[in-house]
Amino acid sequence: MSNPLPRKLFVTTALPYANGAFHIGHIMEYIQADIWVRFQRMQGNQVDFVGADDAHGAPIMIAAEKAGLTPQQFVSNIAAGRKQYLDGFHIAFDNWSSTDSPENHQLAQQIYLDLKKAGLIASKTVEQFFDPEKNMFLPDRYIKGECPKCHTKDQYGDNCEVCAAVYSPTDLINPYSALTGATPVLKHSEHFFFTLSDPRCVAFLEEWVSGLDTDGKTHLQAEVANKVKEWFSARTNPDGTISEGLNDWDISRDAPYFGIEIPDAPGKYFYVWLDAPVGYLASLKNLLDKRGENFDAYMAEPALEQIHFIGKDIVNFHTLFWPAMLKFSGRKTPNKVFVHGFLTVNNGEKMSKSRGTGLDPLKYLSLGMNPEWLRYYLANKLSARNEDIDFNPEDFIARVNSDLIGKYVNIASRAAGFIAKKFDGRVVSDWATADDVFISKLRNVASEIQALYDQREYGKALRTIMEQADAINAYVDANKPWELAKKPENSAALQEVCSRLLEAFRILTIYLKPVLPELAKQVEALLNIAPLQWSDVGTPLPHNHQVNPYSHLMTRVEPKMLDALFDMPAVVDVTVNVPNGTSETEVAADSTIEAIAPEIKIDDFAKIDLRIAKIVNCEHVEGSDKLLRLTLDMGEGRLRNVFSGIKSAYQPEDLIGKLTVMVANLAPRKMKFGISEGMVLAASAADEKSNPGIYILNPWPGAEPGMRVG
């Protein structure tokens, strides 16, 4: 049932920006791609599945500076945290790289030179805001000021968060630098542009968007193609604004900038979105170099299919700039760009950290929740369209428990026990004839399920599989093996019924394996067989084959797990109440000051190891409106993860690079959001209503990470 000629596939997912941990949107996309890759491999197809960190840009450069790190060190620290997510959710990339890799530098510069040779690079003088104190041009998000529409203060340089107006940074009233507070000045600079408006680019893109791939199907989903076509020509939008068609694309940024230098242009760097998609090719080249294979020869193979999985928020980069860059630099263009929607929660509410509607991937794992529950649930929701999908806790519980436990695992639990206890683990297959209706019906849907997986119609595939599970359970109810087991004269019938059930369970496992790879491994061990391939659907367990004793395959989802997953801590964590009074008299006279704790001996205090720590990274905690996740360097050769209830008082970017005081020898604590490896000290008032502030302790200049406080 495999393809006559194996396919050769180069598969990627969108690159995550290397300024923070993975969120659930990343995990959803990786699961979608991983299922497709695993399915293709079960068909006997060759797949190279690669990813990378998007490592360049002003935000990373600035965050690294605040943390007292080089951008490379900052990105490396972020990258070190990727493995726990990927391994945790059984996402099996063949290679993970970085856009700051040597391969990406070389490829990005060569693509630029090829585009320049093709006459598609032009230079223009642009006017930008410049921070005279920082001595750098400011990206839009690092310029703030008063909104020109609603006059709300402290709005970003490209849009207002209050009235949603979109404008140019030069439209801001009283603009200032978000980095230094200085008033920016307008300066001219020469920038380089990829001339996407060139008739050659327009003609190619119109053909690529509407044209057919080698499989006779379009490169894009129909709804995506229709949207992209709207960008090709000037038009008046429903809101009265004018769209000008394809514009030339500014691909350069001025120093200082963390990125890839533009050849023969000192002080100029590629805009991050030019070298980011090149990172797909660079990660593949890095993988091929490790294997001793030639990258150019690999990419030149006519049968190679280049497949990109992305979210709908980055369609323009992947369906306009990226194909045109590849085409006119003389490279292979994408065969498919598969676009998915966003993940919402509770019937369409967007994921929100502040409202407690976020789904934090690490918290999910730290609660001991089975990653394959989530893989199965998301797969049930995913289709070939770029529609948003909804995570509903009640639906999650019902679907996992009903389908995976009640329908699928239940088959093995009913049959394997009898085979082990009464027949020494031996199955029979003399019943397995070509005209066996029960098993034949199960095998006959293989091609239908195969097509649905290939088309990324996972929800339809799983519904078809569960229809087969229903039929198998109906067979159980009709034949009642528990009744057959009561009479010795029914021994042969019992063995045949249970053998049929295990064969049916084996076939269902093949169908589910792309979604549930770890559960499939357990089933392969139970059935004492080699790793299952799609072509094994028609090959039953041999007659007298011995299976292993049944052991529990999967537990049920408990509602309390979902309560914990979306629960927000009710109290501020890891803060210390410190009196605000300045003298003993004032403390005694002020009833709002918290009473001093009972007296302790010096030996008690000596047990507490207080150390100076540097905050090298800080980020919001998905699902919590009180916690920040701090990454701390205490000078011990490793970084620590600490949760602190200071979100109401601080923005993460304001803490990066600061020194603080932490309890270094506090036992690690398993929290709902992960492991906290210490406690940072902060002050807060006993009466939070009159003084709601939280004040993190910050040592005087001269203190260094690792110094003891006492």
From Swiss-Prot:
GO MF term list: ATP binding; metal ion binding; methionine-tRNA ligase activity; tRNA binding
One cellular component (GO) term of this entry: cytosol
Documented EC number(s): 6.1.1.10
One annotated GO biological process: methionyl-tRNA aminoacylation
Membrane spanning stretches: none
Residues at which Zn(2+) binds: C147, C150, C160, C163
Domain of life: Bacteria
Needed co-factor(s): Zn(2+)
Binding site for ATP: K353
Keyword NAD: no
Function: Is required not only for elongation of protein synthesis but also for the initiation of all mRNA translation through initiator tRNA(fMet) aminoacylation.
Family the UniProt entry places it in: Belongs to the class-I aminoacyl-tRNA synthetase family. MetG type 1 subfamily.
Subunit structure: Homodimer.
Protein name: Methionine--tRNA ligase
Organism name: Herminiimonas arsenicoxydans
